[in-house]
Swiss-Prot record:
The keyword Mitochondrion does not apply. GO terms for molecular function: 6-phospho-beta-galactosidase activity; beta-glucosidase activity. D-galactose 6-phosphate binds at residues 19, 116, 159-160, 297, 428-429, 435, 437. It is an enzyme of class 3 (hydrolase). It comes from Streptococcus sanguinis (strain SK36). The gene is lacG. Keywords: Glycosidase, Hydrolase. GO terms for biological process: lactose catabolic process via tagatose-6-phosphate. PROSITE patterns: GLYCOSYL_HYDROL_F1_1, GLYCOSYL_HYDROL_F1_2. The keyword Hydrolase applies. This is 6-phospho-beta-galactosidase. It catalyses: a 6-phospho-beta-D-galactoside + H2O = D-galactose 6-phosphate + an alcohol. InterPro entries: 6P-beta-galactosidase, Glyco_hydro_1, Glyco_hydro_1_AS, Glyco_hydro_1_N_CS, Glycoside_hydrolase_SF.
Amino acid sequence: MTKSLPKDFIFGGATAAYQAEGATHTDGKGPVAWDKYLEDNYWYTAEPASDFYHKYPVDLKLAEEYGVNGIRISIAWSRIFPTGYGEVNPKGVEFYHNLFAECHKRHVEPFVTLHHFDTPEALHSNGDFLNRENIEHFVNYAAFCFEEFPEVRYWTTFNEIGPIGDGQYLVGKFPPGIQYDLAKVFQSHHNMMVSHARAVKLYKDKGYKGEIGVVHALPTKYPYDPENPADVRAAELEDIIHNKFILDATYLGHYSDVTLAGVNHILKVNGGQLDLRDEDFAALEAAKDLNDFLGINYYMSDWMRDFDGETEIIHNGKGEKGSSKYQIKGVGRRESPTHIPKTDWDWIIYPQGLYDQIMRIKKDYPNYKKIYITENGLGYKDEFVDNTVYDDARIDYVKQHLEVLSDAIVDGANVKGYFIWSLMDVFSWSNGYEKRYGLFYVDFETQERYPKKSAHWYKKLAETQMIE
């Protein structure tokens, strides 16, 4: 039976400033840590990416033509405050006013993120969110944007607090490239959640008319053998690192006893301690019921086995299937069931995980209000033929995830929209330009856009709300 989605559903496309804009030093933009980090460590840079800084009218026209009625955009903090605070860059402010005006002209609702992996370099090199001064700088930046851009009706504080801590201090594939420091992972999560809470409280206290929330990446964690208590424990601990710690901060305003016990175990085994203050919990408590929505980014699930060896993580950045490895001392080891498909980058394709994660939010955090799926999509080595890409695998991936999303709505979850990652092809942080996600193919040499087969499919979906 063909499943459907509600009439008022947002069929969106997602982007991010650093991955799409290019123009990394144009019109007074300040540096971000990624600029030098990519030059030093990778075979690509974010220049010109998809040149969204100049091409946004083209992309928004395509969005309108293909039924995309919402777009995720992030503001580059260092375009507004080149050093993260102090002097405002008027050309950066003007760019975003023009961009939001074009969104509204094209009837594409902008959902605007304040921070998408791109802390200004001056603050990043001073500890990023491990430095509590950064909390103040972020809240001040948020306050400026809320006041300056009243045309924005949907605000998100952060994109993926979890993968920031994970990428910067556990896997080490994001600047500053530190590995296996679990205390820094949790401290980064915590300080960013305090920043989120304070920005949300400020937005509500000022009486602004829009909505505000946060976007979390929530990969579902399963025990490899559900009958083995040690595997169950490994999945629970892995879930605390990536999901539960952050969700508790968002919706409980504190960390549950189970969460804290897990964190304490992980730190006892791996070393380090956390700085959690009374005023932090006052801020979290004050904001826990003020989130208007939760954005869920979901691409994959993981299966965990019991493991008692040393930590070792190998990141598969080049799409060489089977080259990744992930095991954490005192937590567990990822091992994927052989019957479940995975991408060339070892991302496990499991739509049921999205359903389970949505229902988990509904059950464990009943004050969630509503959910948007803010990222979901298939990274692929697209073949460009006949001025298009016949991306049936991408269509199939999105279709399967929309079907379980429809099931979740039927089962009582309040899900109001879906944003495919990504609207057009963009640069991928630790994979470069080979891994494409877009509805629209970008020739990175000429910056021409070409609709893929998936764009035509998505248009029909948006027009009919039928998942076919």
